[in-house]
Swiss-Prot record:
Database matches in Pfam families: EFG_C, EFG_III, EFG_IV, GTP_EFTU, GTP_EFTU_D2
Family in the record: Belongs to the TRAFAC class translation factor GTPase superfamily. Classic translation factor GTPase family. EF-G/EF-2 subfamily.
Keywords: Cytoplasm, Elongation factor, GTP-binding, Nucleotide-binding, Protein biosynthesis
Gene Ontology MF terms: GTP binding; GTPase activity; translation elongation factor activity
Record-given protein name: Elongation factor G
UniProt main location, coarse: cytoplasm
Disulfide bonds: none
Binding site for GTP: 19-26, 83-87, 137-140
GO cellular component labels: cytoplasm
Domain tr-type G: 10-285
BP terms from Gene Ontology: ribosome disassembly
Name of the gene this protein is made from: fusA
SMART domains: EFG_C, EFG_IV
Domain of life: Bacteria
Amino acid sequence: MANKREFSLEKTRNIGIMAHIDAGKTTTTERILYYTGKIHKIGETHEGDSQMDWMEEEKERGITITSAATTAQWKDHRINIIDTPGHVDFTIEVERSLRVLDGAVTVLDAQSGVEPQTENVWRQAENYGVPRIVFVNKMDKIGANFDFSVKSLHERLNANAIAVQMPIGAEDQFEGVIDLFDMVADVYDEDKLGAKWETIPVPDEYKEEAESRREEMIEEIAEVDDDIMEKFLGGEEISNEELKAALRRATLDLKAFPVFAGSAFKNKGVQMMLDGVVDYLPSPLDVKPYIAHDKEGNEVELLADDNKPFAALAFKIATDPFVGRLTFIRVYTGSLKSGSYVLNASKNQRERVGRLLQMHANSRTEIPEVFSGDIAGAIGLKDTTTGDSLTDPAHPLILESLDIPAPVIQVSVEPKSKADRDKMDVALQKLTEEDPTFRAETNPETGETLISGMGELHLDIMVERMKREFNVEATIGEPQVAYRETFTVPTQAQGKFVRQSGGKGQYGDVWIEFTPNEGKGYEFEDAIVGGVVPREYIPSVDAGLQEAMKNGVLAGYPLIDVKAKLYDGSYHEVDSSEAAFKVAASLALKNAASKAGAVILEPIMKVQVIAPEEYLGDVMGSITARRGQMEGMEDRAGAKVINAMVPLSEMFGYATTLRSSTQGRGTFTMVMDHYSPCPKSIQAEIIKKRGGNA
């Protein structure tokens, strides 16, 4: 079976390209595809013509939204690349890609170093144990500073970044890079789009600095590898092969992160970074075996082996204009031919894979079979959704699913006509299938459709997609914040439901202790002794509470972070039922509300604003006026970086305010940080607006 493989597992790399928005990630991916022979014309993101940014919305905005998977070849290796979005509204795409990658390239902007979204994606990569190399991009930009960028990796991410190159010049003097292993300089020919470069001895004016940086690099590698340290201290000669092998081991163990320099836009340094992908990032054989669970819940290690039973994870659903519903899969073990049946173990359903495709940003090649370690697109899977496990029908396994964050912002959408209503229903069903952080629901009282997501941009793009892909004309309401409610004071309450109406009555009686459970969500404890509430009714009490908590106690927002301990109650031999105990539990919650110090929680965003110093006063004033708490300030490349915590409700329309107050020179990013109680006056306003119970 294995002989049909085009590339061995050792020569396969599954990598992601991750970065802050505008660090040049898509351009970097473009160049990789250009040099590996996958595209013949280079597309520029800022001209709206990039091969990877294949959805119309991305072309218009010049940002990457969907992680398009694409395949390239470099030095007899196959590199599968997942392009991930750098905008925080699309964090689920990043999480989703990290689940299926073996390694990643983090792209930094040489002028800015580590930025807020870099921190986010770096943390997520740490979470999934993904080895990384770093590409310091935009070395040709004014203010580019390689050493500052390396330092920011150490200081802001606590990452052991080891520079394996030294740039030759910077800004408009950036000519190429010096390889600190081979001690040669790669100098680029300006006219040949960077496809041509010359390897020359290190120029005299750089020799001394390059020698000292090489020494520093060897010392840093020695610190993460005992064998090298021994030779280093003993003054022995250490070969480049030994150094590279040690750095590879340290990178795979997340003890080191090799750093490269270049300018993707000017086509410099990308090829050496590709060598780094091959030299330092893992093949599917180098990563820890993926852990799945069998039907009994036992752990099963999935080794990358074509001869084992098939197991794969569906990590993305896309609606492709040419082939319809496309499921991106990562194969962990075994192989699969097109036309075969698989078991969707998450839903316990058999599905047939019609065709298998190898994806290039928005074109595709049909392939007869996929093998372990491959990433491919499958057509024909009708019921499979993001995070589902696809396995050999004779060996069902569940691969752990994705951790999906709850949406923080909501808007109402009103179709313009009856025909639009029908189209909108279809559109929302497709879009929610594709993106688990996008939700659509109908308010049972008002009948209006509400969509919720990770931020204003996220919802804007979904509405645009409804219009463009499904021809839905709709009116969009004002954005609403996804508030939550919680209890702040421990309390006990009874919920008793008795109904007598001829024949069989209803009887349920519970005493529940409610305590605040900050940051831990809802927990239920059964503390019943002596059977005062029979075993079979206890799950109904839990279910009744969870159901009641969905609509809160103050203004109809979900109640979170509460521990409920069922400790007493009573039942009736004939009249008690699961339904009665469900109602009793919801009554206990209602009765507790007035004594439990119920409050409304609002989402607090971690906001970072970058603006020239002359606008500092305006920016800080504007943040304070929005109930923002300053968290600190730093200097960065001639600008001030302001960190603050600001309630989401105050951030609507901030982009416009910032643009006008800084004459378009200020930028900001925000990411959800935590929930915090609203000030009393704002809470009263929210309750009044929602017609709740103050």
